[in-house]
Regions:
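Conserved SF1/SF2 helicase motif Ia
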Residues: 1-21, 34, 114-117
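Structural beta-sheet core signal
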Residues: 10, 40, 120-122
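Conserved structural-core and active-site-/substrate-pathway-adjacent residues in large, well-folded domains
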Residues: 13, 25, 38, 64, ...
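Conserved nucleotide-binding/hydrolysis micro-motifs of P-loop NTPases
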Residues: 14-18, 23, 44-47, 66-69, ...
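Conserved helix-turn-beta segment of the N-terminal RecA-like "Helicase ATP-binding" lobe
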Residues: 17-42, 135-142
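Conserved motor-coupling elements within RecA-like helicase/translocase cores
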Residues: 44-62
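SF2 helicase catalytic motif II
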Residues: 61, 65-69, 75-120
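Conserved interdomain linker/interface between the two RecA-like ATPase lobes of SF2 helicase motors
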Residues: 109, 117-193
Length: 193
């Protein structure tokens, strides 16, 4: 049976990603019929929504490192997090080694001392040294598990140059003249960055 209250925190470095994560989590919850609720807490969250969350936290809270710290600094935060069992850090490679990453590390250390059996997930698509990333995220966790995709992607780099350059602009204007060439490459690709 579903019991209301915060069960998981999903930290993302980008507020724009928080909306996508919320929508994806809501689709899964709806498809599975779990009744789980999802909320967002960022600098963009209205005072009305913050008050609603204060009265009744969602099951999954998608937030940023800064907003998480504001919640932790709130009187009575212990009651908010008492039922939390999962902590997900998205785009860990973006946060690691930065001030925002330190905020995540401090929050995790604080929560680990107050929540027994907290499961911590670090998610990243691009990281050079995964062992170091795990150690930074989970310094006090004895059992660490890596899940690494074996999929090898073929990467093709296609430089795009103008057909003719009389004067090379200093900045900003060269890209516009290449838009048609870039659009053609994108239309022929499954995935383009």
């Amino acid at each position: 049976k579903h019991t209301p209250g915060l069960k998981a925190v999903w930290v993302t470095p980008l507020r724009a990603l928080s909306v996508e994560i919320k929508q994806a989590a809501e689709r899964v919850a709806d498809d599975l019929g779990t009744g789980l609720t999802v909320g967002i807490r960022t600098g963009d969250t209205s005072a009305t929504e913050k008050n609603r969350q204060k009265a009744k936290m969602p099951d999954l809270l998608v937030t940023t490192p800064e907003s998480l710290h504001l919640i932790l600094a709130t009187k009575g935060y212990e009651a908010v997090f008492k039922g939390c069992t999962a902590f997900i850090v998205d785009e860990w490679h973006e946060l690691m080694g930065s001030k925002r990453g330190v905020l995540v590390e401090l929050a995790l250390g604080y929560l680990q001392n107050n929540i027994s059996n907290l499961k911590i997930w670090g998610i990243t698509a691009t990281i050079g040294n995964i062992d170091e990333a795990i150690e930074v995220l989970l310094p006090n966790v004895s059992k660490k598990i890596k899940i690494v995709s074996k999929e090898k992607k073929q990467i093709e780099i296609i430089p795009v140059y103008p057909d003719k350059v009389d004067v090379l602009p200093w900045a900003g204007h060269l890209g516009g003249s290449l838009a048609d060439k870039v659009a053609e490459i994108i239309s022929q690709s499954r995935s383009t960055l």
